[in-house]
Amino acid sequence: MEVQSSSNNGGHSSFSSLRVYLNSLSATPSRLSRRAISVSTSSDEMSRVRAVSGEQMRRTLRWYDLIGLGIGGMVGAGVFVTTGRASRLDAGPSIVVSYAIAGLCALLSAFCYTEFAVHLPVAGGAFSYIRITFGEFPAFFTGANLVMDYVMSNAAVSRSFTAYLGTAFGISTSKWRFVVSGLPKGFNEIDPVAVLVVLVITVIICCSTRESSKVNMIMTAFHIAFIFFVIVMGFIKGDSKNLSSPANPEHPSGFFPFGAAGVFNGAAMVYLSYIGYDAVSTMAEEVENPVKDIPVGVSGSVAIVTVLYCLMAVSMSMLLPYDLIDPEAPFSAAFRGSNGWEWVTKVVGIGASFGILTSLLVAMLGQARYMCVIGRSRVVPFWFAKIHPKTSTPVNASTFLGIFTAALALFTDLNVLLNLVSIGTLFVFYMVANALIFRRYVPVGPTKPWPTLCFLTLFSITSLVFTLIWKLVPEGKPKAFMLGASAVVAIAIVLSFQCVVPQARKPELWGVPFMPWTPCVSIFLNIFLLGSLDAPSYVRFGFFSGLIVLVYLFYGVHASSDAEANGSFGVKDGQVMKELIEV
């Protein structure tokens, strides 16, 4: 039985009193059956759901703004570390091929985001895409995990800014931080610089999206200039012999010292350097011409970043033999050990500092817009959905998440934070690719979704089997046979689906090519990368996933049910997925 009471505005509320709320909890099963897999429609997301925010975001961004935001979001300080680590441990000089492969895969995954963003130009990004496809709870589960990943990552990035700033000025990090006795290790180093950076960026993104884009453009231009400078210095000082000859003759030699396995292991490691383009899709509501600007902005930024990464990889591989590369600070260490070139180390620190600021700005823009649209769905308080009438930005969401990020950055050690990021982002990429296939092959209305759902499940299982074989089975002929067999099965599954199940709809404006192969590659890649993450990542994912489920059970499902009863959601729309499953 649904238990509701009137709120002050004449609507229904499950939270008007403790008694009403406790009675509402008894209706949780029936509300779950109605709301958990209820889908919204594109027209509702563009009209009634957007209206929850009151004011509208201004459409002021063009394709070049999106390219700048995409580059700024992807090219952070991490590339200065990831390149050396992947080259030293996995790929050797062939790290440039690893970056090219990872860039191609990132582009395929970005295509999935682009089709949704063109069709549904709202600020919700992946949350909105999954909500119109799989329903409310899957959208909240993935979106909330992504927001937590954003917050953790931004806190980690802001603390690393202190370290790179110290490198640029030749000052030890300990001079910028102070230790508080009595606090547990990992939480006792206070970093006021990180807090200041987060709060300043929070103020910037609250003031104006257009001005934020201009600030990002300026900092990104400086960052790219520093990167090109380091690349040129690497080519000048480097030696092409290092592309094939290790320092130790006993180590594997050649351009591919670790073979194909090393190239793909390297690609898996450096793929995380491309994370950031998804934040561009959250800006869709503020783009002047989404049909034209979003495909150019997203694809263009990924392509440019791929070229930059490949040039950096070649430059670094020429600087030193791969077995002498410092996996923690490859460029800085290479120049620091050369007479007369130590000053380049400070240039690297300055460039990395700009990269941190741009990636932090873009990520904080993205996390606020995710939170804003989650608030529009009412599964979190719709206070987060409010748009400021003067700035046309989600000030409430930006301020709340900015303060939360600053609090984490103040106390929490970088290594603690880094163990908590990445899995949510990869999981969202995986869900968006699945959602795109489902949306293309399952029409809205009474129909049978099971062939598509079975295909997605079988392909995911096969991809997981391939990943486990790659990670766990020792090298040898049995491993090669098992990998080949699982690959053949995966290809056969896709071919069978393509032949048996016709596309139910084709996009009118912009669509992903080579369906369903393109999103399938994205699904496989994200499962493969999820399999490469360490145990603490899954502990974090399980912990926060449990919290998210509890929030939905004790708040979200009741708040969205109230919104439906008050007319914020269409009853017909809320029944679409339920009707699909009942067929």
UniProtKB/Swiss-Prot annotation:
Keywords: Amino-acid transport, Chloroplast, Membrane, Plastid, Transit peptide, Transmembrane, Transmembrane helix, Transport
Name the UniProt record assigns to this protein: Cationic amino acid transporter 6, chloroplastic
Membrane topology: Multi-pass membrane protein
Coiled-coil parts of chain: none
Organism this protein belongs to: Arabidopsis thaliana
A single cellular component GO annotation: plasma membrane
Biological process according to GO: response to nematode
Highest taxon listed in the record's lineage: Eukaryota
InterPro entries linked: AA/rel_permease1, CAT_C
Compartments in which it is found: Plastid, Chloroplast membrane
Entry's transmembrane regions: 63-83, 91-111, 132-152, 186-206, 216-236, 255-275, 294-314, 347-367, 397-417, 418-438, 450-470, 481-501, 509-529, 541-561
GO-annotated molecular function: amino acid transmembrane transporter activity
Pfam families documented for this protein: AA_permease_2, AA_permease_C
Record-stated family: Belongs to the amino acid-polyamine-organocation (APC) superfamily. Cationic amino acid transporter (CAT) (TC 2.A.3.3) family.
Transit peptide: 1-50
